[in-house]
């Protein structure tokens, strides 16, 4: 019997609903719980991050027991959904072991926190993460253990690691090293409090009302996520007409399978291969054709008017010499066909007119501020900043000032800690933006962002198609949360941009 298994056997239950949500997290020992969740005395405080950004959060929740500190931290190299190395962290407290894995992106913004790779071309094409693993095992772990901080105090632990790193973009230890520890700390903090992870996150963010999100299913993949000719990266369906998350999943799944049949009938079985995020990757070049295929599938499923469409253009991937190359995967693309920003904006306006599009992400290059502001100013739909904002408070503040977009794409590995991710969301919300929680194209089985989107109640999440286990891990976690909360739980639906 393993040490971890023996820990589980020695502990007693707190709440079967909690265990269904968080299994196999350790249960609270009898001398701590008496089979009921403990009561907490919470202090609200303003936390100052090293980045200079302030936000109000539940700084510390103290039980009737002593503080629970970290006993051990162990990092290792595992593999993500693309077969590339990534970081996994095990954190041990008196309650047992808490595990977190870090995702990785393909189309990454130049302003993201640094993902530390070994750059040894003889191993994994330079993508191994043994340096980041070493930083956790040799520095971050030992220093955190010596600091003796309570795992419930997420902000203090995250800020401790930020200061220890000492760089603006976490380039000393790597955001992937720091994030692995931060995620594991959040899970340990939830267990110490005897609550599901989403409730702990809600406490950290000061969120009083739980609202389940609309899923944005990426059903056609292009750009850097697929080996086809399609330039624009993601074509998504949003079941905004659903009345529950369960119904939204049903609608998404049915449209996904209708789409497979539509693509198969038009292009043959070979065209139904899937991309990195589980969406189909037919070898088409016309972005409008992708939208037509999705519209046909929605109609065949009987959900016209109940399902809307979103796009992630990832335009930074095909921005060349001040123009946009929609044939960028062709090394011999015709430069005369490249589009200036105003022509590309006109194309988006045509899409919005012809299709039920409610959201466009990264329509222009990450530093093409004027083009962003012009489009956001002349449309009522959601314009999402991903590469533009990279979950970074400084970039968000600039985007707010320039009125460049109206929604933040929240990716925890872009900024590197749970605390800073929450801060980014709160800053966006304060300025009237929406927030869409997001996965990365290189994912793991870790379902953390499923709890994150519920805890923050942002109203929308994108984590791929209803296909591939690393994508379904997040959607399935939200289904479990919906079941645990029970009747009366709110679903964002048509109000996904500003859930209430």
UniProtKB/Swiss-Prot annotation:
Residues holding substrate: 225, 234, 361, 386, 438-441, 462
Membrane-spanning ranges: none
Main localization of the protein described in the UniProt heading: cytoplasm
Cofactor comment text: Mg(2+) is required for catalysis and for stabilizing the dimer.
Location of the protein in the cell: Cytoplasm
EC number: 4.2.1.11
Amino acids binding Mg(2+): 312, 361, 386
Catalysed reaction equations from the record: (2R)-2-phosphoglycerate = phosphoenolpyruvate + H2O
Cofactor(s) it depends on: Mg(2+)
Quaternary state and interactors: Homodimer.
Protein name: Enolase
Taxonomic source organism: Drosophila melanogaster (Fruit fly)
Top-level taxonomy: Eukaryota, Metazoa, Ecdysozoa, Arthropoda, Hexapoda
């Amino acid at each position: 019997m393993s040490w971890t298994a023996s820990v589980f056997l020695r502990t007693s239950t707190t709440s079967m609903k909690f265990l269904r949500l968080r299994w196999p997290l350790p249960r609270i020992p009898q001398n701590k719980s008496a089979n009921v969740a403990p009561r907490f005395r919470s202090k609200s405080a303003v936390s100052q991050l090293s980045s200079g950004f302030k936000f109000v959060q539940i700084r510390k929740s103290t039980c009737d027991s002593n503080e629970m500190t970290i006993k051990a931290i162990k990092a290792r190299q595992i593999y993500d959904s693309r077969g590339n190395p990534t970081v996994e962290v095990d954190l041990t407290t008196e309650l047992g072991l808490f595990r977190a894995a870090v995702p990785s992106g393909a189309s990454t913004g130049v302003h993201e926190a640094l993902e530390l790779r070994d750059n040894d071309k003889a191993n994994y094409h330079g993508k191994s993460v043994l340096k980041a693993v070493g930083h956790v095992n040799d520095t971050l772990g030992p220093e955190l253990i010596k600091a003796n901080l309570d795992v419930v105090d997420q902000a203090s632990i995250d800020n401790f690691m930020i200061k220890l790193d000492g760089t603006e973009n976490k380039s000393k230890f790597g955001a992937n090293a720091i994030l692995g520890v931060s995620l594991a700390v959040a899970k340990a903090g939830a267990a110490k409090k005897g609550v599901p992870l989403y409730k702990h996150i809600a406490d950290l963010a000061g969120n009083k009302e739980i609202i389940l999100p609309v899923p944005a299913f990426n059903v056609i993949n292009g750009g850097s996520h697929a080996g086809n000719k399609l330039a624009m990266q993601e074509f998504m369906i949003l079941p905004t007409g659903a009345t529950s998350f369960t119904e939204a999943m049903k609608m998404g799944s049915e449209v996904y399978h209708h789409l497979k049949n539509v693509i198969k009938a038009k292009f043959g079985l070979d065209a139904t291969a899937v991309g990195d995020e589980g969406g189909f990757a037919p070898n088409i070049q016309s972005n409008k054709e992708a939208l037509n295929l999705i519209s046909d599938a929605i109609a065949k499923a009987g959900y016209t008017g109940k399902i809307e469409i979103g796009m992630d253009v990832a335009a930074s991937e095909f921005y060349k010499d001040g123009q946009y190359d929609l044939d960028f995967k062709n090394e011999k693309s015709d430069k005369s066909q490249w589009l200036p920003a105003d022509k590309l904006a006109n194309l988006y306006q045509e899409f919005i007119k012809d299709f039920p599009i409610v959201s466009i992400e990264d329509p222009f290059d990450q530093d093409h501020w004027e083009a962003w502001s012009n489009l956001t100013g002349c449309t009522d739909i959601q314009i999402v900043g991903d590469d533009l904002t990279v979950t970074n408070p400084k970039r968000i503040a600039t985007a707010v000032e320039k009125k460049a977009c109206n929604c933040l794409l929240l990716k925890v590995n872009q900024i590197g800690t749970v605390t800073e991710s929450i801060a980014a969301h709160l800053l966006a919300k304060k300025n009237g933006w929406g927030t869409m929680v997001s996965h990365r194209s290189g994912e793991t089985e870790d379902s953390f962002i499923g709890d994150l989107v519920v805890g923050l109640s942002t109203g929308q999440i994108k984590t791929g198609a209803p296909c591939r286990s690393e994508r379904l891990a997040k959607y399935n976690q939200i289904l479990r949360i919906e079941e645990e909360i029970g009747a009366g739980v709110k679903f964002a639906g048509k109000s996904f941009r500003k859930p209430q």
